[in-house]
A protein has these predicted regions:
Chain A
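Transmembrane alpha-helices and adjacent helix-loop boundaries
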Residues: 1-236
Length: 236, 261
């Protein structure tokens, strides 16, 4: 187990990069997922179709394939995902700004894939809002967008937050794939390096990597349990 | 089918010429169910029209058609001389001019009573929040629940919630108000407080379409009573006339049922 001590900096660095990947992908997934959910319930049929098609594709494709398309398809299309080199953001998440695009590709793949599940969690939250709420909002003259923003979504979030948390936990675990698609120095890529390049023993290395993921997922899970329990008490 | 009294000469109502709400040959189907059958109705400014009829006769649908919460299949509905616009900004604007009060209150559950009342004025009418707040407090005072302003809907009694819902509708300064069985979800002891607010609105000259089974309200506050059955307007008469002398069998039958208990 000495590898955990000897290469603590590698694990810590891998954790930090995976953490950044997860923060960015989760943010993107929440934004895109909310947008797609709104499209799916919009009164405009073509928007609904696009939303439904999006969810159908991304919910039913293996993440590996989505990662593959991002890592090899985007460059083939001539994109280095430079739109993610957002000034300001790159100073916090320095990997976003570098020339090597694989971190950006991983963010995109993970965010787009997770967005389909975020969409469905939000949609179930929207469906849990009594229809009278939206109706009353329409009756006082709120437009579709205002209705969502001020009446429906704030209430939908409440019942969506626990399923959303589960989606994000799944996303954190899924982020382990990034190391196999060109991202250097995240938790899974660090593990590969330590075992194949440096010949460290496999089991302790993967225990270290597991701890890295558990540090992110377990607190989130506990938080969700808390929220759920508080809800249950409030509902009584 | 429709027997309408030409001029409206009743119950101390002040009504003027051009109708504010007008339905011409309105038909509405839910699948095979013909819920509104060739409905013609006009409601003058300042007029209070009570709609009664057996369950399932289409009263709610009629009420909801007027602000297009329920789209119709044929015919025309005009409000304030304009045909109802299709879904979109113009319809939202029209809806803001027609207050609606629901059986189940439908107050925004995540907002305080005060926020419920100011949301429309601030977001739809772009009023200054402080001004909207002042006006909202006056309205809450008017309906007698100013001291509940900071509470959430679930913390109020049914009667208080319904009065808050009326205040929310009034905050938009509507040209007309639609009420769909505003007191049927209330415990009996709270019905009076809501009817009092509605009666005072009627006195102040608000144009109102009220679906209700409160015959006392119909007698005292309405200019006209409309009796609906199976999607048709079967009778349209002054309250005194209607209650003393219903013309159709359906109406006689209905009245005998609701007035015997
Ligand atoms: N969204 C809907 N889809 C299908 N059928 C509907 C819908 N809304 C109402 N109906 C049907 O249309 C008919 C008229 O309904 P409506 O609610 O207008 O009646 P109502 O006179 O208001 O009855 P109540 O006194 O019970 O409120 C009923 O038979 C009802 O079942
Ligand atoms: Mg009804």
């Amino acid at each position: 187990m000495s590898v955990l001590v000897d290469h603590f900096d590698v694990f810590a660095g891998g954790f930090w990069l995976t953490f950044q990947l997860c923060i960015l992908a989760a943010t993107g997934a929440l934004l895109v997922g909310t947008l797609v959910a709104v499209m799916r319930i919009s009164p405009v049929p073509p928007l609904r179709w696009i939303g439904t098609a999006y969810v159908t594709v991304f919910r039913n494709s293996p993440l590996t394939i989505v990662m593959f398309f991002a890592a090899f398809g985007l460059p083939a299309l001539g994109s280095n995902a430079d739109f993610l080199r957002i000034p300001g953001l790159t100073s916090i998440f320095s990997r976003l700004g570098i020339d090597l695009p694989y971190f950006r590709f991983a963010v995109i793949a993970l965010a787009l894939y997770t967005a389909a599940f975020v969409c469905e969690a939000i949609r179930s939250g929207i469906n849990a809002v009594p229809p009278g709420q939206a109706e009353a909002a329409r009756a006082i003259g709120l437009t579709f967008g205002q209705n969502l923003r001020y009446v429906v979504l704030p209430q939908a979030w409440k019942s969506a937050v626990v399923p959303l948390g589960s989606v994000i936990i799944a996303m954190i675990k899924n982020s382990a794939l990034a190391g196999f698609f060109g991202v250097i120095g995240d938790l899974s890529n660090s593990a590969q390096n330590l075992t194949s390049a440096l010949g460290e023993p496999i089991i302790p290395v993967f225990i270290g990597v597991s701890i890295g993921f558990l540090v992110m997922t377990v607190p989130l899970g506990i938080l969700l349990d808390r929220i759920e329990r508080r809800r249950a008490v409030a509902a009584r | 089918m429709t027997e309408r009294t030409e001029a409206v000469e009743v119950a101390g109502g002040t009504t003027t010429g051009e109708p504010l709400i007008r339905l011409d040959g309105v038909n509405k189907w839910f699948g095979p169910l013909h819920v509104l059958q060739d409905v013609n109705l006009s409601v003058a400014r300042g007029e209070v029209v009570v709609v009664i009829g057996p369950s399932g006769s289409g009263k709610s649908t009629l009420c909801r058609a007027i602000n297009r919460l329920e789209p119709i299949n044929s015919g025309t509905i005009t409000f304030d001389d304009r045909p109802l616009p299709a879904e979109g900004k113009a319809l939202a604007r029209l809806r803001s001019e027609v207050g609606m009060v629901f059986q189940s209150f439908n107050l925004f559950a995540h907002k305080t009573i005060l926020e419920n009342v100011t949301l429309g004025p601030v977001k739809v009418r772009k009023e200054k929040p402080a001004a909207a707040r002042d006006r909202a407090m006056k309205l809450l005072e008017r309906v007698g629940i100013a001291n509940q302003a900071e509470k959430y809907p679930a913390q109020l009694s049914g009667g208080q919630q319904q009065r808050a819902a009326i205040a929310r509708a009034l905050a938009m300064q509507p040209k007309a108000m639609l009420f769909d069985e505003p007191t049927s979800a209330l415990d009996p002891e709270m019905v009076g407080e809501v009817l009092d607010v509605m009666t005072s609105l009627a006195r102040d000259g608000m144009t109102m379409v009220v679906v209700t089974h409160e015959m006392g309200f119909a007698r005292h506050a309405a200019n006209r009573v409309i009796f609906m059955a199976d999607g048709q307007l079967v009778e349209d008469a002054a309250p005194d006339e209607f209650f003393a002398n219903p013309r159709s069998e359906r109406a006689k039958d209905f009245l005998s049922k609701i007035l015997t208990h």
